[in-house]
Amino acid sequence: MGQIVTFFQEVPHILEEVMNIVLMTLSILAILKGIYNVMTCGIIGLITFLFLCGRSCSSIYKDNYEFFSLDLDMSSLNATMPLSCSKNNSHHYIQVGNETGLELTLTNTSIINHKFCNLSDAHRRNLYDKALMSILTTFHLSIPDFNQYEAMSCDFNGGKISVQYNLSHSNYVDAGNHCGTIANGIMDVFRRMYWSTSLSVASDISGTQCIQTDYKYLIIQNTSWEDHCMFSRPSPMGFLSLLSQRTRNFYISRRLLGLFTWTLSDSEGNDMPGGYCLTRSMLIGLDLKCFGNTAIAKCNQAHDEEFCDMLRLFDFNKQAISKLRSEVQQSINLINKAVNALINDQLVMRNHLRDLMGIPYCNYSKFWYLNDTRTGRTSLPKCWLVTNGSYLNETQFSTEIEQEANNMFTDMLRKEYEKRQSTTPLGLVDLFVFSTSFYLISVFLHLIKIPTHRHIKGKPCPKPHRLNHMAICSCGFYKQPGLPTQWKR
């Protein structure tokens, strides 16, 4: 009994200690909150800006996302697919293997005097390089409704390939008058393969683009491969875009079944733990760059990014070399069948049209991405657009960079939420929901002030007596019935 009395005597001292602890805790919280408010109110950012403005630039966006870029070296792809490039607006090249290629020249000088092309005879006598000729055949078969054979001349003396197409659209009137001719079709195919300003659209008649040029001939010849490409880097995209348009009616599915599958990693990242790495042979100025499964998984979910197309091409090239050990001709035959599983031809055509319209476009050679300095995760690289032959300045697409940073932050929050949900017991979540609901209901009940007893109007509180609706109490203290009452809390 004495212990109980002692305990109750110490209660005021205990309460004083608790109050001291509460005051100390609240003081610490207030100081921390004040420091946070000062850090986020903008004054420190303003002071930093005023101190560094005009002296230093930063590649950090949204405080945590660092801006990087990479340049792809597509010269290694020539083992399995033709690469095209331009020396200038009139001289264009296709590289096949490491030593040979085709030169496509827009010129006003004819090199073949006759007007016929006996291709079947050359094929029967095996006069030409089959790999080169298959590329030429792809170009020729892409010309719509070719039936004017006088528009084409060829010569295969001693294995030398010489093909000459006649062009006749030097001005707006000629282009309009000959819009449906073979020459217009030749120029349209050439314009789709090489993003060149030497050919321009003069008009559009019933959906057919009428193309004009100052040149009279398109000449295709085989050539030894040198360092021709000064105007543009070697790229397979032009030739592959022709292939995809020719074959899309026959290969409807975008996934090549059988020998190769083009899933870079599955949704959980089991195929390639750590993502996908670009090696020295694929990059310019870098030895190695890896992208995690978070970025690469987006390539498997959708077929709508230029960088994903390039990864598929590099992956195709690597697997073809390691598994097939094929010669050039066999590789070209394989890429003919696989093209629709590798690239999105709609993306290629969209970028081509953007170039023709003078809008910044993607040339598939340079990409930018963001790196999260906290987690080390990277975004899926996006194409660094080109206009007037040069890459855009970083400030010209800063809005897209900010949006990508926002997307990465949102994706991080979503993943953290999913992770938290997966590690939290379901019963604990139910208990939290019940306790929160109970608390909100109790607050509501407290706010509505439910009455607890009756008063006689104009009289003081009758407690501890409990009046009934007749204003009387069974103890007899209130015994005058019929007085007006009201509920009170």
From Swiss-Prot:
Paired cysteines (S-S): 85-229, 117-154, 179-210, 277-290, 299-308, 362-383
TM regions (residue ranges): 18-33, 431-451
Lipidation positions, renumbered (N-myristoyl glycine): 2
GO biological process, one term: receptor-mediated endocytosis of virus by host cell
Residues reported in the UniProt entry to bind Zn(2+) 1: 57, 465, 473, 475
Parts of the chain on the Extracellular side: 2-17, 59-430
Record-given protein name: Pre-glycoprotein polyprotein GP complex
Source organism of this protein record: Mopeia virus (MOPV)
Name of encoding gene: GPC
